[in-house]
Curated annotation (Swiss-Prot):
Its EC number is 6.1.1.16. A motif ('HIGH' region) lies at residues 30-40. This is Cysteine--tRNA ligase. GO terms for molecular function: ATP binding; cysteine-tRNA ligase activity; zinc ion binding.
Length: 465
């Protein structure tokens, strides 16, 4: 059974879906005014992997992740660039899909936009006003935070603790410093929509509550996002949604840990701000994904050149194992009969992978399982005789596990197998003709392409190394 860490309770719990065999999952998406940075890539990769694993275990997953396509930062950036805000957000939504697509992140079943959900947002706020959980003030609408008795439960903060640090900013017309905005009155030159409270646009927090309700219902299985969203965003979502719907909003809350660069918080002021768009120009996107999955998702992760190089080398070793198994399958002359020992070992690793992922989606252990499979494949390839059934099983399980992790194990091979075979024949001919200079040149050419030659009792073998 899948166990996941619930941020609401602070402990691992068995996953029990609202509806047998189905998962309703909402993940907070980006505000689209720039390329996403590598910190944004972590939740995209993590929760894509969670989704993949649920699917692998037989669940039907409905996955919703929004785009905030109107807000203060978008409006400011559009004005600075002299660009229509619709054109700006459209451009960066396309960039988001391109960048996350390179990371093998599957598109959500639904990617709702705030600008296309405005009627639902307004209707949601109307219910809160009618119930007394929200109030209008000079064209703005605020949520009456003290009306929700469980406020602070997710972030484990009391109302009194929160009140001590709360302030009313200039221009705000709140009853209480703890209240937060649901609807902002229009400002000159900014996009606005007609509402019962006048022209305006929604606050940030209400958007996700309205979109989750529209596409997944009043109660969902899993709500997920980065650790930085726990407070105030997710806390406010809970208050709004449960006040509006009179039902529990989400049964499980999942939050991924922070990402630092070279042990420092990423920021433009430190000059270490790195977008995914920039990163994947220098690093194989699969290496970046593999790196992200090498650490358990709740733990902080440190992005550094050394750690990326380690991830690249590790992934290369696994890919080489796969390529060598594929190649050995073409060498039918020395294929023997299968032994239960090796088939059982492959199955043990697969089952351990499932155990790893059942334990709060522990991809760090799952990656280790992939290394173990690679190690066993290499040992098996060293046998004098290998069996087609075992080789095919190695490949099938490599494919199965890597698909769950979303990491592709195919590589650009350089020389094709038949080209390698021809060069080996040419080298053999040169040696027989005592043309050792040519034989050595061919050997060096093969070595430069990562081809290793070895003499065996069955003759010359080669592998990619």
């Amino acid at each position: 059974m899948i166990q996941l860490y619930n941020s609401m309770t602070g402990k691992k719990e068995p996953f029990k879906p609202l509806e047998e065999g189905k998962v309703k999952m909402y993940v907070c998406g980006p505000t689209v005014y720039n390329y996403i940075h590598i910190g944004n890539a972590r939740p995209a990769i993590v929760f894509d992997t969670v989704r993949r694993y649920f699917t692998y275990r037989g669940y039907d997953v409905k996955y919703v992740s929004n785009f905030t396509d109107v807000d203060d930062k978008i409006i400011r950036t559009a004005n600075e660039l002299g660009e229509d805000y619709h054109a700006l957000t459209k451009r960066f939504i396309e960039a988001y899909h391109a960048d996350t697509g390179a990371l093998n992140v599957q598109k959500a079943d639904i990617h709702p936009l705030v600008t296309e959900t405005m009627d639902d947002i307004i209707a949601f706020i109307e219910v809160l006003v009618k119930k007394g959980n929200a109030y209008a003030s000079s064209g703005d609408v605020y949520f009456r935070t003290r009306s929700f008795k469980d406020y602070g439960q997710l972030s484990q903060q009391s109302i009194d603790e929160l009140r001590s640090g709360a302030r009313i900013e200039v221009g705000e017309k709140k009853e209480d410093p703890l209240d937060f905005v649901l609807w902002k009155a229009a400002k000159p030159g900014e996009p606005a929509w007609t509402s019962p409270w006048g022209e305006g646009r929604p606050g940030w927090h209400i958007e996700c509550s309205a979109m989750a309700k529209k596409y997944l219902g009043d109660t969902i299985d899993i709500h997920a996002g980065g650790q930085d969203l726990k407070f105030p965003h997710h806390e406010n979502e809970i208050a709004q949604s449960e006040a509006c719907n009179s039902q529990k909003f989400a049964n499980y809350w999942m939050h991924n840990g922070f990402l630092n660069i070279e042990n420092e918080k990423m920021s433009k002021s430190l000059g270490n701000f790195l977008t995914v768009h920039e990163a994947i120009q220098a690093v194989d996107p699969m290496v970046l994904r593999f790196f992200m999955l090498s650490v358990q998702y709740r733990h902080p992760i440190n992005y550094s050149r050394d750690l990326i190089d380690q991830a690249a080398n590790g992934l290369a070793r696994i890919r080489e194992s796969v390529a060598n198994v594929e190649h050995r399958l073409t060498m039918t002359a020395d294929l023997g009969t299968a032994t239960e020992k090796w088939l059982n070992r492959i199955e043990e690793i697969k089952q351990h992978f499932v155990t790893s992922m059942d334990d709060d989606f522990n991809t760090a252990n799952a990656v280790t399982d992939l290394f173990d499979l690679s190690k066993e494949a290499n040992l098996y390839l060293g046998e004098d005789q290998v069996a087609k059934e075992v080789l095919e099983r190695f490949l099938a399980v490599f494919q199965e596990l890597s698909t769950v992790l979303g990491v592709t194990l195919t590589i650009e091979k350089g020389l094709l197998d038949e080209e390698v075979e021809q060069l080996i024949r040419d080298r053999d001919t040169a040696r027989k003709e005592r043309d050792f200079a040519r034989a050595d040149a061919i050997r060096d050419q093969l070595r430069d392409q990562g081809i290793l030659l070895e003499d065996t009792a069955q003759g010359m073998r080669w592998k990619r190394g």
